[in-house]
A protein has these predicted regions:
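Catalytic-core elements of nucleic-acid end-processing and repair enzymes
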Residues: 1-308
Length: 308
């Protein structure tokens, strides 16, 4: 049994070079065949990092750990939002923090505040990880203007959840009770009634073993995203060297994906135009991903939040 575990592959690479194959994967995942979360990226060469972290560190940032020191969340956030033309969002984040501090007597750091705003229905581009393959496909092509391959990362929840639960259990035994931020997020995860009006709501389900992950409309936002990526790294492998295997689309769809908690779908740039048509056909537009509605978080701040 131990040898089998050691021989198990960790990451698969699947190249998709036809729109027909892409449609098959879309149908496969949208039917719920496999418990995955997805991240779409405009460049297949990028590692699996959040948009915020990638902007801060460029391509020097490695998936297996960080080569940077600690910086205040506000510096990260301001720089990222300014570079992406979303400076107004930072003002809204500060306003949210002010309201939260007034109501609950706790000052949120900027990243936590940004994540909670999105949780309450406010559009945000801070992290584009989804339970929907099609939503990830949107992010893999949104604003793309280069002839480079895109990518969709798929993380198999079923395969990592058991070990993740053991990791968090050991951490709790070692460090005692979780801090107030984790307790707060757990509380918010139970507030399902705020999901009713938005188009991408999905239950938290198997992801509730990650205490700092917030689900909103099928999209995930993490106030401590670097912590999640690091814990995911430890979950997938006990050492920094991934075992990588390349497989065909047919092999994956026929069940060969079972030994791969992490899958990278490389989308050939040769099908870019056809993908654009597919997104239009599925009505996956900016307006649908980021609903152009009046933010609803103010009303939801009145929900009772406990720290017990």
């Amino acid at each position: 049994m131990q040898k089998k575990s050691q021989d198990m592959k960790k990451q698969a690479i699947v190249v998709i070079d036809s729109i027909h194959e892409l449609q098959r994967f879309s149908e496969f995942f949208e039917m719920g065949l496999g418990q995955y979360i997805f991240r779409g990226q405009k460049r297949s060469a990028w590692n699996i990092l959040t948009s915020l972290e990638r902007h801060e560190e460029g391509e020097k940032c490695k998936y297996w750990g960080s080569n940077t020191g600690q910086k205040p969340g506000g510096i990260h956030l301001t720089r990222y939002l300014a570079a992406t033309g979303c400076s107004n969002e930072y003002e809204e984040i500060l306003r949210f923090s002010d309201t939260w501090e007034k109501d609950y007597g706790v000052r949120l750091d900027d990243l936590t505040s940004a994540a909670l705003r999105r949780h309450f229905g406010c559009p945000s581009r801070l992290l584009d990880v989804s339970k929907s393959f099609d939503v990830a496909l949107y992010f893999a092509y949104e604003g793309k203007n280069t002839k480079e391959d895109s990518a969709i990362w798929a993380i198999c929840v079923d395969q990592i959840s058991g070990r993740a639960e053991r990791i968090f259990s050991m951490a709790k035994e070692r460090f005692g009770d979780v801090d107030w931020e984790n307790r707060l997020v757990k509380e918010l995860l139970c507030s399902e009634k705020i999901y009713e009006k938005m188009p991408f709501v999905l239950p938290v389900g198997a992801m509730n073993h990650v205490p700092w992950m917030i689900a909103q409309k099928g999209m995930f936002l993490m106030p401590l995203s670097k912590c999640f990526m690091q814990s995911l790294a430890y979950t997938l492998s006990g050492h920094p060297a991934l075992q990588v295997a390349t497989m065909s689309a047919e092999q994956f769809l026929n069940g060969d994906q079972k030994n791969f908690p992490l899958v990278k779908f490389v989308l050939s740039h040769q099908i870019d135009n056809e993908v654009g048509d597919l997104l239009s056909e599925k009505n996956l537009t900016k307006k649908r991903i980021f609903p152009d509605e009046k933010p609803i978080w103010v009303d939801h701040l009145k929900l009772k939040v406990t720290f017990q």
